[in-house]
Amino acid sequence: MRYHVVLFALAARLRFAHAQDIATQAWPSPTPGVFSIPNFSFDSGETLDSLDIHYQTLGKLEISDDGRTNAVHIMHGSIARGDQLLTEEFAGSLFNAGQILDADKYFIILRDGIGHGNSSGPRNTGLHARFPSYQYNDMVRADHQLLTEHLGVNHTRLVMGVSMGGMHTWMWGEMYPDFMDALMPIASLPVEIAGHNRLWRKTFIDLIRSDPAWENGEYASQPLVSLLGAMGLLQVMFQGQELMQREYPTRNQADNFFAQSFEAVLAHPDDYDVNDQIYAWNASWSYDPEPELEKIRVPLTAVNTADDLMNPPQLGILEKLVHDRMVRGLGRAVVVPTSNATFGHGSYIKASLWVDELASLLDQTIIPRVARG
């Protein structure tokens, strides 16, 4: 199944494509776990008695005498979860034997961020709209606690992420600059969410909150009218213009595509819980790594695609900030040209588009590890 066919329907993508990929996977089966953080304090001043972070790992952790490890921390996108990355398009290009992140050589960490997947969030805690208003900073801090306090990782070989996870990657480089050998943010920009990107997110949130069926977050069933409207907006933002015109060149084809997408949502509406989505999209409100980019101390390769409506290359933001605000020589900005292989923002899931850049980054940052005696 082509990834873009279900675009925003990440749960549907996981239900169908993930099941097929697992049946033919060559990478090791992941080991799941849960880390419970007591009395987690959010930047909003709110606290949660117990914050559960669900995670999966592949491979075995190896720690050298100098504290360096073979750990690779990879972060998913908004309204997704770690399973998003266990597909043939992603894991099948990275984690198999002999590939760049061979799971027999690396300890790969895939967590569900706060409010996503099986980690604590508005829906699965029963708190609904009373769940603490988390921001990206909270998510990164919780990840750091997961790695250091639970998994025993105090230094990683690589921190990388896609979309929201890409934004978190910039933050990791600033908040914990000595924690990794290399950074690779994908499908993101190191600048606050403003302009067009903020407007569509705010429209998405306000559309749901203005629906009487939302009932201030205490609905008994998903408010379908606003849910479908919001997901339609996300559909438009997620796809590439060239791809949409190429594959749906007539009015009827475009309408049918939208109808099929809506059917995927209506078949499993709880997979798109609107409280979870409101929180997830609002979590970017305080994101703004630009002022502290000079804090990044390790090589970084940022990759976007030319047909990404969420991170439009014509703004020139990525190249300018990497060149002007980062320590000279540490950053590299890459924009993958539009092609039949790209499909807008969601192109990040197709690791074949950027795996060569990852290989180059890892080669650049090889640091001899001191073996334990």
Residue map of PLM features:
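Catalytic active-site module of serine/aspartate enzymes centered on a nucleophile-bearing elbow/loop
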Residues: 326-373
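Catalytic-loop region of hydrolases
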Residues: 18-74, 78, 82-84, 88, ...
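N-terminal cap/lid subdomain of alpha/beta-hydrolase-fold enzymes
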Residues: 56-125, 317
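Active-site nucleophile loop of the alpha/beta-hydrolase fold
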Residues: 113, 184-194
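Gly/Ala-rich beta-loop-alpha elbow adjacent to hydrolase catalytic centers
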Residues: 161-165, 169
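Conserved alpha/beta-hydrolase "acid-adjacent" motif
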Residues: 309-317
